Regions:
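C-terminal, non-catalytic macromolecule-binding modules
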Residues: 151-177
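Generic long, charged, amphipathic alpha-helical segments
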Residues: 174-208
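Zn-dependent metallopeptidase/amidohydrolase metal-coordination segment
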Residues: 129, 133-146, 153, 202-237
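Midchain, well-structured core segments that form catalytic/ion-binding scaffolds
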Residues: 1-154
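Short glycine/threonine-rich loop-to-helix capping motif typified by GTGT followed
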Residues: 43-51, 99-105, 190-203, 226-230
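Catalytic-loop motifs flanking and including active-site residues across diverse enzymes
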Residues: 15-19, 50, 165, 197, ...
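Glycine- and other small-residue-rich loops at beta-strand/loop junctions that grip anionic moieties
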Residues: 8, 190, 216
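A structural preference for short, hydrophobic beta-strand core positions in alpha/beta folds
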Residues: 36, 91-93, 180-184, 215-217
Length: 237
């Protein structure tokens, strides 16, 4: 879990992305239908939990899936134990009557989208100690009675790179038959290697407190991006 801006560099596991891989791998060896799936609460939060219910036609196939699921959980735990020591996966098989499920073609497209959608960091600034420049976070995934929703939060301090990320998701949506909507957008705020106001701020801090100010760039949306877009040439820190 954590904030997808401030903590995306911690290499935290995203439960929605793990579920996408989980469903993909199960689908290679078993035939299931997706009854429902729900993961995450906010698009800008790294997903901590994701749960789903699958339907199998017979108990033998369900038992096979249970064994595969347990094996996959062990593989995931081994892969992420260094940064997610508290990872857990609960698996239960129950008997019941038939239920409504996501249509087969929609389910395949859904799983493929979850599996292939970019997530995490995909560009850093090596001149700034690996400062994150571009990332995305699959924050919410949910099936409803008549639609499937995937909410993603892409971030970049560079406008052109943000547009590149958006085009990737637009292409994925088109490929798998999803509609895409944009909301809550705000402009990026590129780091200025030279800043007179920053130099003045550092000098003033030194004079006032007798110590050096710690400067830190963060991969998160700030009002400065809005101000900088509205006032070209603004020197903001």
């Amino acid at each position: 879990g954590g904030h997808s801006g401030a903590e995306i560099d911690k290499n935290r596991a995203n439960a929605n992305k793990l579920m996408g891989l989980f469903l993909y791998e199960l689908g290679q060896k078993t035939a299931y239908s997706i009854k429902d799936l729900s993961g995450g609460t906010k698009d800008n939060a790294i997903t901590r939990e994701c749960e789903m219910s699958l339907i199998y036609a017979d108990s033998a196939e369900a038992q096979k899936a249970e064994k595969l699921a347990c094996d996959l959980a062990e593989v995931f735990a081994d892969e992420i134990t260094s940064f997610e020591p508290d990872f857990s996966c609960e698996i239960a098989v129950t008997e019941g009557q038939s239920a409504m499920a996501v249509q087969e073609e929609d389910a395949k497209a859904f799983v493929s989208l979850m599996r292939l959608a970019p997530n995490g960091i995909y560009r850093r600034n090596i001149k700034m100690n690996g400062f994150v420049v571009v990332s995305s976070n699959m924050g919410v995934v949910r099936t409803e009675e008549d639609y499937i929703m995937v909410a993603v939060s892409p971030r970049s301090s560079v406008a052109s790179l943000q547009e590149d990320t958006k085009s990737r998701f637009a292409l994925l949506a088109e490929t798998f038959g999803f509609e895409i909507e944009y909301s809550g957008e705000y402009p990026g705020w590129s780091y200025a290697e030279e800043s007179k106001i920053r130099d003045l701020f550092v000098e003033s801090y030194r004079d006032l407190f007798g110590s050096e100010l710690r400067l830190e760039a963060i991969h998160a949306g700030l009002e400065c991006g809005l101000f900088s877009e509205a006032i070209p040439g603004l020197d903001a820190i």
